[in-house]
């Protein structure tokens, strides 16, 4: 279903209107207000997914342009939409009300619960098992690479899982024990009104376990600094501003937590001949006034394998006329029909004429007829009428 429809707002809605609509629906369908109601839980995840996209300017722009699948369907799409579990939906919920999962939040929930540090089972704290940070890199492609698609190797700096302890943070399996306070759950639960709040266990920082004999290689963190090569397959048809998400290619998490994601932002270099407008290509083709008058067939460049195609320019063509060559444009990133090549004709007036050339043009001018220049005749007729209106 369309995200705007899910939130009940128009496509022209302001960010404030989108946020207001989401807050109203999120409170209505929150699982703590609807215990055991599977449909309410589904709707809560659904509105959270919609807000995750429409509440972010960049994601919203991509959604408006390409739809729900995004330009990189199968590679992450909007990078965050798709509430597969309640934790993601609750994180979106808290963010919309000004909450912060690290215990530094304010706004609505802090006022409601009195300094809420952790809520609804969200894991936070300054220590313990935390998901690895996401990484962001920019990659510049040539115009041809964007058209054909390309494979690239990127060198990414960050953290990888510690090989010595397999990411556990402990020297041996005996160097870890279950947390006595939370009994391994990583959370301590409190009830206030109809809300049940699960805050991070202060003894194990939400990990559910305590490392008694830390790994000497990573000092109990479960990860170490690293540089690695990442192979990226970029599809044909990409454009500047598009984003590719590679799940799990960011920093490794601490103490066995999931890795973050890698976001690759695309920049495409301009082309010396073509301009891109969506999936269409625009080519400015200068021709002489004789060719424009008599018509001509010309070989013009394309991005296809053949490299050129023949264009039939009809006689009497005017400067600014656009001729369309179907299917010779840019490939569509979704695999749909290729765009068209739009050839804009530019009739060039000759310069630096010889005396002989000037004489030939004068002779041609003497043979001119009104039907040779319909625009000129139309203009003269108009100004005759204009001056006659002011005749005394």
UniProtKB/Swiss-Prot annotation:
GO cellular component: cytoplasm
SMART domains: DnaJ (SM00271)
Domain J residue range list: 2-67
Example of a GO biological process term: protein refolding
Residue stretches of each CXXCXGXG motif repeat: 162-169, 179-186, 201-208, 215-222
Keyword annotations: Chaperone, Cytoplasm, DNA replication, Metal-binding, Repeat, Stress response, Zinc, Zinc-finger
Keyword Transmembrane helix carried by entry: no
Keyword Repeat: yes
Compartment(s) of residence: Cytoplasm
Cofactor(s) listed in the protein's UniProt record: Zn(2+)
Zinc-finger ranges (CR-type): 149-227
SUPFAM superfamilies assigned to the protein according to its UniProt record, in alphabetical order: Chaperone J-domain (SSF46565), DnaJ/Hsp40 cysteine-rich domain (SSF57938), HSP40/DnaJ peptide-binding domain (SSF49493)
GO molecular function, one term: zinc ion binding
UniProt xrefs under PANTHER family: CHAPERONE PROTEIN DNAJ, DNAJ HOMOLOG 1, MITOCHONDRIAL-RELATED
Assembly, per entry: Homodimer.
Function: Participates actively in the response to hyperosmotic and heat shock by preventing the aggregation of stress-denatured proteins and by disaggregating proteins, also in an autonomous, DnaK-independent fashion. Unfolded proteins bind initially to DnaJ; upon interaction with the DnaJ-bound protein, DnaK hydrolyzes its bound ATP, resulting in the formation of a stable complex. GrpE releases ADP from DnaK; ATP binding to DnaK triggers the release of the substrate protein, thus completing the reaction cycle.
Designated name of the protein: Chaperone protein DnaJ
Annotated source species: Chlamydia muridarum (strain MoPn / Nigg)
Gene: dnaJ
């Amino acid at each position: 279903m369309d995200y705007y429809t899910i939130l009940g707002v128009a496509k022209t809605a302001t960010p404030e209107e989108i946020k207001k609509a989401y807050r109203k629906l999120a409170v209505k369908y929150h699982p703590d207000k609807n215990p055991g109601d599977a449909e309410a839980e589904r709707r809560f995840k659904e509105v959270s997914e919609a807000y995750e996209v429409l509440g972010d300017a960049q994601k919203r722009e991509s959604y408006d342009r390409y739809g729900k699948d995004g330009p990189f369907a199968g590679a992450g799409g909007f990078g965050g939409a798709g509430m597969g579990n309640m934790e993601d939906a609750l994180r979106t919920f808290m963010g919309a009300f000004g909450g912060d999962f690290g215990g530094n939040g304010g706004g609505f929930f802090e006022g409601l619960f009195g300094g809420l540090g952790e809520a609804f089972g969200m894991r936070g704290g300054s220590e313990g098992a935390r998901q690895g940070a996401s990484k962001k890199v920019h990659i510049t492609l040539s115009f041809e690479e964007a058209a054909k698609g390309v494979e690239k190797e990127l060198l990414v700096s960050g953290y990888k899982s510690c090989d010595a302890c397999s990411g556990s943070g402990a020297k041996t399996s005996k160097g870890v024990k279950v947390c006595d306070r939370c009994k391994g759950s990583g959370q301590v639960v409190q009830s206030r009104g109809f809300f049940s709040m699960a805050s991070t266990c202060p003894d194990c920082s939400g990990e559910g376990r305590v490392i008694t004999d830390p790994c000497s290689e990573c000092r109990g963190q479960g990860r170490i600094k690293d540089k690695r090569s990442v192979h990226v397959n970029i599809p044909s048809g990409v454009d500047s501003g598009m984003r590719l998400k590679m799940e799990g290619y960011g920093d490794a998490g601490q103490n066995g937590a999931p890795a973050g994601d890698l976001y690759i932002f695309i920049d495409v270099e301009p082309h010396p001949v073509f301009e891109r407008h969506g999936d269409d290509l625009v080519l400015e083709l200068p021709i002489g006034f004789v060719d424009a008058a008599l018509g001509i067939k010309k070989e013009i460049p394309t991005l296809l394998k053949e490299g050129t195609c023949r264009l039939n320019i009809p006689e009497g063509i005017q400067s600014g006329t656009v001729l369309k060559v179907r299917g010779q444009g840019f490939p569509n990133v979704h695999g749909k029909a290729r765009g068209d090549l739009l050839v804009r004709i530019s009739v060039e007036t000759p310069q630096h004429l010889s005396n002989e050339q000037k004489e030939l043009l004068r002779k041609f001018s003497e043979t001119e007829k009104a039907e040779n220049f319909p625009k000129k005749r139309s203009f003269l007729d108009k100004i005759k009428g204009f001056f006659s209106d002011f005749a005394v």
